Amino acid sequence: MMLNKLKKELKENSDSKKAKLSQKYFKTGKGEYGEGQIFLGINTPKKREIAKKYVNLGLENLRKLLESNIHDEKFIALIILEHKYKNSDEKVKKEIFDFYLNNLENINNWDLVDISCYKIIGDYLVDKKRDILYELAISENLWKRRISMISCFAFIRKDDLKDALKISKILIQ
């Protein structure tokens, strides 16, 4: 029920002119990196405002949003997921970390990666083994490689550059 309400609110806030510009900017044409993604033309502040109303959506509903080909739905799902993560105990943070990793195929554009991975993957790994980042760094998938690097921002903020430098070397090879 809440999921349908959210989708309805997104459609009500759509802007076809902005959507067309976003489709071009995010390279959604055939053969481009964002191929097949649909944009509703909602600006980021508005998406964040809408997301705040739906922070109680469960992981199953967030999975449905991430599986959508509507980019704005994915974006909102990640904003909500980051909010849940930030306000959770260690057990729930682990669940959200695992959920994120299990849904990497759907985190498939640079803005989706950049708004979320360092706040979830990076933050979770600050005091843990970071092997998963090295696995992502050697992936064939562009977005997994980007996640491996951007997640390091959480470490860099704590003056820990070691993994960022190692991963950057992997990525430039």
Put a short name on every predicted segment.
Residues M1-Q173:
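Alpha-helical scaffold domains
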